[in-house]
């Protein structure tokens, strides 16, 4: 049985999860083991209701409030406020790598998850990065 893991780290709307639904259904129909590593378990449970998908909470990073940008007008600003420039970056990457080791997926499907993408540069799990031009950094 193949194992896949979907990730969602940043952003607020259900669109980050809904786009996964057709692929998750197909994988489940193939009898694959499907995981979702998400920032909001409640939203994931609503979207994947009725599917045998394992849902795990991840803790998105953040920069201490005093160091955050007040106005966000670019992707680097979002990354800054999400902990990329904080002392906790190494812990965030280690947490993702730990989750990948625990689950051992054969495929990652990544949506608006920059720390997961960075951690996967180390883990080297085959991956698909999905999203809009804004949520997929170069």
Regions found by a protein language model. Name each.
Residues 1-5:
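Extreme N-terminal starter segment of soluble prokaryotic enzymes
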Residues 6, 29-30, 34-87:
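Conserved nucleotide-sugar phosphate-binding/catalytic loop shared by glycosyltransferases and other
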Residues 8-21:
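A short, glycine/small-residue-rich beta-strand->loop->alpha-helix junction that serves as a flexible
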Residues 9, 113, 131-134:
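Histidine-centered beta-alpha loop that forms part of the nucleotide-sugar donor binding/catalytic region
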Residues 26, 118-119:
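Hydrophobic/aromatic ligand-binding patch that stacks against planar heteroaromatic rings
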Residues 72-107, 113-115:
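Conserved nucleotide-sugar donor-binding subdomain of glycosyltransferases
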